[in-house]
């Protein structure tokens, strides 16, 4: 199931449908000016969304995560650790362990957090201050409330009747 870029598109379509809006969608490059030359609206994600909001705050009409929260009273989960079903469970557990270990280092060791921010700075147009704030806004764990939000998204917006399935 490919959802990396499609997640936001699926979420936008779902939220617009709840408002009885059914616009035509066109796949375009992430150039805000170019997108708005040809279309009435544009969906930007990630760094480009943050940059677009910074430079053109008057154009921001909808924050997908905030709208989902207002609509469902549940947080939106924008990223998960996923593997193929045929991946050996021992390898999945090993990878999960490394991810959790890195998260703990990021949360508890200021120098590790700074390394991550510096890495992100080298790949983004965002400022150190904005990246530091961003990493403080992102929740990197899934609790029961987030799982409930994820399952509602998967069942309602993606029509996956079973919701999230876990290896263990």
Where are the language model's segments positioned?
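Alpha-helix boundary recognition
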Residues: 17, 35-37, 107, 121, ...
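Pocket-lining segment of extracytoplasmic ligand-binding domains
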Residues: 28-117
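Bilobed "Venus flytrap"/periplasmic-binding protein-like clamshell domains
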Residues: 1-40, 45-49, 148
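Secondary-structure end/capping motifs
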Residues: 88-156
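Conserved C-terminal helix/tail region of periplasmic/extracytoplasmic solute-binding proteins
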Residues: 160-168
